[in-house]
Amino acid sequence: MAAVAASASFSIKDFFKSFMLWELAKGMALTGRYTFRRKVTVQFPEEKTPLSPRFRGLHALRRYENGEERCIACKLCEAVCPAVAITIESDVRADGSRRTTRYDIDLTKCIFCGFCEESCPVDSIVETPIFEYHGEKRGDLYFTKDMLLAVGDRYEPEIAAAKAADAKYR
């Protein structure tokens, strides 16, 4: 008798909903609505989405206007890097200041967190808006000081513009 009372709670409406595959019909209706909407797919090589001025891409080392390297070999970026991707060696100049002799970034280790850029007291290391680069071998993504300076020299106007646009938020 108790079994009959328990099955009585299952109504005829519920039976038709389950028998007629109501959930399947609702799912197909939802799929149909999205089928005829405007597509949001970006055809990447031809179309590009706008980048934020804070986008963190390929690293670069900057120079002062007189051509001197900005890096003072304080090694803060090396110390703060959570991935241990930065290696710095330095020498003392005749005037007592330090300058880097070796500044390497292993991009296979780098997580592009931006801590190196934030910790730099002279804005020497920056992350550029460049995200289209690749390496065919593991060593291709190991950037030396000369390579980083070349990137900085080539993209200095863009880097300076991004820094200026972001200055009021820092």
UniProtKB/Swiss-Prot annotation:
Residue positions binding [4Fe-4S] cluster 2: 81, 110, 113, 116
Location of the protein in the cell: Cell inner membrane
Gene that produces this protein: nuoI
Residues that coordinate or bind [4Fe-4S] cluster 1: 71, 74, 77, 120
The protein's name in its UniProt record: NADH-quinone oxidoreductase subunit I
Cofactor descriptive note: Binds 2 [4Fe-4S] clusters per subunit.
Organism this protein belongs to: Acidovorax sp. (strain JS42)
One function term, GO molecular function aspect: 4 iron, 4 sulfur cluster binding
Span of domain 4Fe-4S ferredoxin-type: 62-91, 101-130
Subunit structure: NDH-1 is composed of 14 different subunits. Subunits NuoA, H, J, K, L, M, N constitute the membrane sector of the complex.
Keyword Cytoplasm: no
Pfam families assigned to the protein according to its UniProt record, in alphabetical order: Fer4_7
One cellular component (GO) term of this entry: plasma membrane
InterPro entries: 4Fe4S_Fe-S-bd, 4Fe4S_Fe_S_CS, NADH_quinone_OxRdtase_chainI
Required co-factors: [4Fe-4S] cluster
Family: Belongs to the complex I 23 kDa subunit family.
NCBIfam families, per the entry: NuoI, PRK05888.1-4, PRK05888.1-5
Topology term for the membrane: Peripheral membrane protein
